[in-house]
């Protein structure tokens, strides 16, 4: 029979090896084991109470979420904010503080914590001494690949004052302030031919295309781009306001209006002119067209305006005399417009006594014109006036109108001849008739072409109301009424006779003069008034009984223009017995124009 499986006890092995476990009564007694659990070191590990407290789980969840959010925030700060922002801005600024800095004290006892809260606290204390300022130019690597245009838009969106940001970047790029090159226009409707524009974040392709497109709008173009800023100096062919310029540039460069700074340039600043002049010589600057006059005046040696010319009053008087400017406002405005072309006008604008020069110039021109008029005969005066009339007309218009008013043309021509030659008691013509018959239109057209004067009886209370009669060759008193007829019958009989009278003029003693040729219009036929019988022989009257005819389009049937009177005097020159101009010039005198300006010693004759 075989041996049973398993281990067999052999001699000598049971002395040192425990083959079987010894049984204990205590371990087998489970009840006794549970009874002794109160004496254990881990007592109250299990709560046998049946009542369980829920606890504030929502507050615990909120605390955990707050910790996670704070961790994410600290990671972002360490990633995007530069701790050396102040040192990068200025090393000296970092050392300047408003309050004394205190060194952190060492802790006497090390804090015991799980690690997270204590670490965050220490990091906050270490960074609190430096101010974290986000740099506008700092961008993450991933965002920098999007494009510089998007970065520039982001900078403008982050800025609270767009204009200040643009001006700061302009000065950083070009080294000068934008206001140092420009003068301010507050209104968007003020027009100017010259504009300076600083445009931010323009695409390179659009900037290159604008160099060609602007040539059709401007006489001079100056363009330069540095970094994100582009500077334009545009001299437009016609004046434009700021709104029009912005509309043109936004459509051409595909930019927003907030990206544009626009002001007119300083035209009288040498430093600003030198900036544009020297900048045009740089390799990075595009220019088109000749230099503007205001730039050339201040930069180019030998230019006419660079010479320090003193103001010459005689040149201004000669200019006003040649252009027939007698009014002070016309002289001041027109001479100021002449400044870009005349150095004497520039000197006048730079003078402190502009108003005094204008008054004196107007007075001198009136003196010269009055002296010239007195020297001329009536024939020479008429010839001079009709020579200045441009265009051609036909004298038959006047003849037809007189025939329409049932006026004998031969008798009117004879009366006009006597009036122009100042025949005694034939020196005045009266046109009378009902209202709206063309009396004033007829006489006013003659006064206009012969440069006569109009007197108004409304000023008769002044003793100087007849003063214009001493400054003209022909005068008109329109719409004479009974008070005016009474005044003429009382005071003006000698004047209507063609004799010398004493005429009181303002700011001077009474002068001895004769009345010029006088035209009157009235609704009263003075020849039918017995009260004014002493005026009958002194006035030649013609009646206009018919209403003035008008066309369907409300235009006059008879056009009494300067050209019509020019043709009238030219055609009837001999019938009016006006002297020939060639006969008046046979005395051998030179027919040179009047010269009232001072000549230089070396000027050619």
Curated annotation (Swiss-Prot):
UniProt key word Phosphoprotein: yes
One function term, GO molecular function aspect: DNA binding
Region annotation Disordered: where it falls in the sequence: 580-605
Subcellular localization, as worded in the UniProt entry: Host nucleus
Motif Nuclear localization signal per record, residues: 77-79
Binding positions for ATP per the UniProt entry: 433-440
PTM annotation, UniProt: Phosphorylated. Sumoylated.
EC number: 5.6.2.4
One Pfam family cited in the UniProt record for this chain: PPV_E1_N
Record region (DNA-binding region): 145-308
Domain SF3 helicase: start-end pairs: 407-557
Subunit structure: Can form hexamers. Interacts with E2 protein; this interaction increases E1 DNA binding specificity. Interacts with host DNA polymerase subunit POLA2. Interacts with host single stranded DNA-binding protein RPA1. Interacts with host TOP1; this interaction stimulates the enzymatic activity of TOP1.
Record family assignment: Belongs to the papillomaviridae E1 protein family.
Protein name per the record: Replication protein E1
The organism of origin for this protein: Human papillomavirus 14
